Regions:
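Bacterial N-terminal signal peptides that target proteins for export
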Residues: 1-10
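Short, low-complexity disordered leader/linker segments with a strong preference
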Residues: 6, 22-25
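Bacterial N-terminal signal peptides
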Residues: 9-18
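Hydrophobic membrane-targeting alpha-helices
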Residues: 18-23, 409-413
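Soluble extramembrane regions of membrane proteins in the secretory/endomembrane system
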Residues: 24-392
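Core alpha-helical transmembrane segments of integral membrane proteins
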Residues: 381-414
């Protein structure tokens, strides 16, 4: 155990006590008519990544709003990207695999209905798998398997609950992103468009956005030789960002970076992560010119952790009536910490929509604190390091405990 990690753990514990004794949590102001919510998804990004000077726009949003460490664990200890998005959409811990696993060709297959899939189109495949017609422009081909997987688990998550609630209330939902690892011309496409599952309805259909191959462009220096086309993504956002709408925008280059990390050096991993963050921030900067934080809510989240570790993710919220401070929810009951299941109830609460009983998560509240933006970020980084150290010690301590018990038993027998 290093001195720095010990100090981080002690510091985080002291800060947690201090902030818990501060001002009580408060709920943001009542939503304004025709309000909108922008969800910025940063796959596999942690608070440590955001201390770099590569994301000034995203950091600016977080600095003026309330922030927290996001627990991304769902049913399994390590949450894959699909499980993270399914959980966001359900407001309850969800899983993307089970006794009836989602096929690899479908797990991330959120497709525009006219896209080629197999010998036909995505619309054809959707109807063949569900027996329903595709009535929305985007469909999730893994919907039947996803629903079946939940029935094998304790939580019995209602897939698409957030999308259903938004639709009932007359809100438009859209997703913009494409983290595919192959081009559309590949004979064996590797789809990674699971962002669709966060806002789709319970039928696996989504009313707007863009997730097709038009969103990616070739760059030989990027992971898998692909990167998001920023101008196309911004244009798609402009079309989707209308009154009474919820739009999820994914930093898809970040997801490709994480999938690529096993074949590059640690130094190069840092370099491509920083480049992906810079490009994501540039995209968000252009989109934010259309966002009014006096009326609109922006939520920033990391839907899944890096594939190599299980750190706390990033959570942040800015908008009407949201003071700078620390996020909290009735799920965690701790200042500065929220869970992935809290995202959906928060979106609905910000829009004045009743939260369905099927959702176990609770909406964010904000606890005011004397810490400035840098101190809040440092607190979350230190808390994350302390949490990872604690997790790393569980197995060794358990082994020592078992050995000691065994020795005591042997000693008693002798």
């Amino acid at each position: 155990m290093t001195k720095r990690r010990l100090a981080a753990g002690i510091g985080a514990f002291i800060l947690l006590i201090v902030t818990a004794q501060g001002a009580g949590a408060n709920t943001p102001d009542k939503p304004k008519p025709n309000g909108r919510v922008l969800i910025i998804s940063l796959p596999e990004i942690t608070w440590s990544d955001l201390t770099q000077r590569d994301a000034p726009t995203i950091r600016g949003i977080l600095d003026q709003g309330a922030v927290g460490g996001l627990t991304t664990r769902t049913i399994t200890r390590v949450t894959a990207l699909t499980e993270g998005y399914l959980t966001v959409g359900a407001g309850t811990k969800a899983i993307g695999k089970g006794l009836k696993p989602i096929l690899l060709t479908s797990k991330g297959a959120g497709l525009e209905v006219g896209e080629k899939f197999g010998t036909g189109t995505a619309a054809d495949a959707y109807e063949q798998r569900t027996g329903q017609s595709a009535r929305q422009p985007i469909v999730y081909l893994g919907i039947a398997a996803a629903i079946a997987a939940q029935q094998e688990e304790t939580y019995d998550a209602k897939i698409g609950a957030l999308g259903d609630a938004l639709k009932r209330a007359g809100y438009n939902s859209a997703a913009i992103g494409n983290a595919d690892r192959t081009t559309s011309k590949s004979s064996a496409p590797e789809y990674e468009r699971s962002l669709v599952t966060a806002l789709m309805d319970s039928h696996g259909q989504l009313g707007g956005g863009e997730v097709g191959s038009e969103l990616i462009e070739v760059n030989a220096k990027a992971p898998f030789g692909l990167q998001i086309n920023i101008d196309t993504a911004v244009s798609a956002f402009d079309d989707a960002w209308k009154p009474r709408s919820v739009v999820l925008v994914e930093g898809s280059d970040l997801a490709r970076v994480d999938a690529y990390r096993n074949v590059v050096s640690p130094k190069q991993t840092l370099a491509i992560t920083r480049e992906a963050l810079r490009r994501t921030d540039a995209m968000v900067k252009k989109m934010m010119t259309k966002v009014d934080l006096e009326r609109d809510t922006v939520i920033v989240l990391s839907p899944s952790p890096p594939s190599t570790t299980v750190p706390l993710g990033v959570a942040g919220m800015a908008g009407p009536g949201i003071d700078a401070g620390l996020l909290r929810s009735a799920t965690t009951r701790r200042d500065g910490f929220v869970q992935l299941v809290d995202i959906a109830p928060t979106v609905l609460t910000q829009l004045g929509i009743k939260v369905p009983e099927t959702m176990n998560g609770k909406p964010f509240t904000v606890t005011q604190t004397d810490m400035d933006a840098n101190a809040r970020r440092d607190f979350l980084i230190d808390s994350d390091q302390a949490s990872q150290f604690r997790d790393s010690m569980i197995t060794p301590v358990a082994i020592v405990f078992i050995i000691m018990i065994a020795l005591l038993v042997v000693g008693a027998i002798i």
